Design a protein with these regions (language model features):
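Short functional linear segments
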Residues: 1-53, 60, 66-71, 78
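Internal gly/pro-rich beta-alpha loop/helix module
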Residues: 159-160, 173-180, 185-188, 193-246
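C-terminal helical cap/extension that packs against the catalytic core
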Residues: 200-220, 286-287, 326-384
């Protein structure tokens, strides 16, 4: 197989949660442990940083990576989902995994993958560990895929675990209360390690404290020590930056200082290519893309909207099945012109599903590019266009813009 055929096999032949939903989710560590053993890999031969939580995992991984790069370390990152290219998920510094490595890996291990019945995510994680091990990264930053306790990434023994925050998402799998969700996330806390918690929550703090006591693990709540320093005018990114800084400090790196931290924050785009977090993709009118897809995310973007001056606001939304749309759109300004579209995946909410979720009539077009063109035609140069609801909208809209 060439690379295009290999990528197609990975994306379309393996059970893929992002495309198919919970039917493709394969919880548990038995199969991934078998896979790692078949690959002759060891789950503790790298210096791991394990990042979980509901929101902010990806940006936290990116800021940790950027700061460590400025300290002259070779840093691997494993994140999800990807926006434009599968290879975004596996990087060393800001260099995507080589196509040739992916093709060779799948060719060599295809029969093992099929015999074990591995999911897309399990294969991707095995690929990442193989790549980082071969390239002898100094640190490997691993983002949890879903939950924590039963996530494929939970076979690692990290130097430090991070839980950014706890909010409602994937409730059909993780549970429908914050306490149940926190219990799943707390599964990444390992014995005699460290835990960094980004945001305090009176409903979940004790769960993390008790788990850390059981594991003889040190716990740090970032909000107790972060101070008043503002690194970004995007509030939720500022929280994630503080979490990233405390994570890097917990590694006790002698060369780490305030100047290196400052450079890491300033050079985030150069070092990591971070995208999808209140990303400006057009001007006159201002066009923003944000990957918010749950209540906490929509609350954050509503806060950002309140800081911007504009004439009218146009919001293009696309969702995967299972989203409680009323609980999300209630955060948006009352005078918003709201449009809905479909995503080009089988999990996309349909027109009928969107209509049945809302009390008022909706403007809908199943073609993202067409409705985006319509919005741009109707908007004046002083308006704001916001695209959000799912990372799957990014590729369609970004290419069109």
């Amino acid at each position: 197989m060439d690379y295009k055929e290999t990528e197609n096999w990975i994306l379309n032949r393996l059970p893929f949660y992002q495309n198919s939903g919970s039917v493709a989710y394969k919880p548990g560590l038995d199969n991934i442990n078998k896979f790692i053993k078949k690959l002759n890999l060891c789950n503790n031969q790298l210096k791991f940083i394990h990042v979980g939580g509901t929101n902010g995992k990806g940006s936290t991984c990116s800021y940790i990576s950027s700061i460590l790069q400025e300290s002259n370390f070779k840093v691997g990152t494993f994140t999800s989902p990807h926006y434009f290219d599968y290879r975004e998920r596996i990087k060393i510094n800001n260099h995507k995994i080589e196509k040739s490595f992916i093709t060779s890996f799948i060719k060599k291990n295809k029969l093992i993958i099929e015999n074990l019945g591995l999911s897309f995510f399990q294969v991707s994680f095995g690929l990442c560990l193989s790549y980082f091990t071969k390239n002898k990264v100094d640190y490997a930053i691993i983002e949890v895929g879903l939950g924590g306790r039963l996530d494929a990434t939970n076979i690692i023994n990290p130097l430090v675990s991070v839980i950014t925050n706890i909010s409602y998402d994937h409730t059909e799998i993780l549970g429908d209360t914050l306490e149940l969700i926190a219990l799943e996330k707390a599964g990444i806390i390992k014995e005699k390690s460290q835990l960094i918690v980004g945001e305090k929550n009176k409903l979940t703090d004790e769960i993390f404290i008790n788990r850390c006591k059981e594991q003889k693990t040190k716990i740090t709540f970032v909000s107790d020590i972060e101070g008043d320093m503002i690194y970004s005018d995007i509030d939720y990114l500022n929280k994630n930056i503080h979490t990233s800084i405390q994570t890097c400090k917990s590694l006790n790196i002698n060369s780490l200082n305030d100047e290196i931290i400052k450079r890491g924050i300033e050079n985030i785009n150069i070092n990591t290519g971070l995208f999808g977090r209140w990303s400006l993709i057009g001007i006159n009118p201002m066009i923003i893309f944000d990957s918010a897809h749950n209540e906490s995310g929509f609350e954050s973007i509503a806060n950002q909207i309140s800081k911007i001056s504009f004439n009218k606001i146009h919001i293009l939304l696309g969702f995967v099945k299972g989203k409680k749309i009323n609980d999300l759109v209630r955060y948006l300004p009352k005078n918003s012109n709201i449009y809905f579209t479909s995503l080009k995946i089988e999990r996309s909410m349909t027109h009928d599903e969107i209509k049945s979720s809302l009390t008022e009539s909706v403007t809908f077009d199943n073609n993202p590019q067409r409705i985006f063109k319509k919005i741009k035609t109707e908007a004046s140069k002083d308006d704001l266009i916001l695209i959000t609801g799912s990372n799957y909208l990014a590729k369609e809209i970004y290419n069109e813009n």
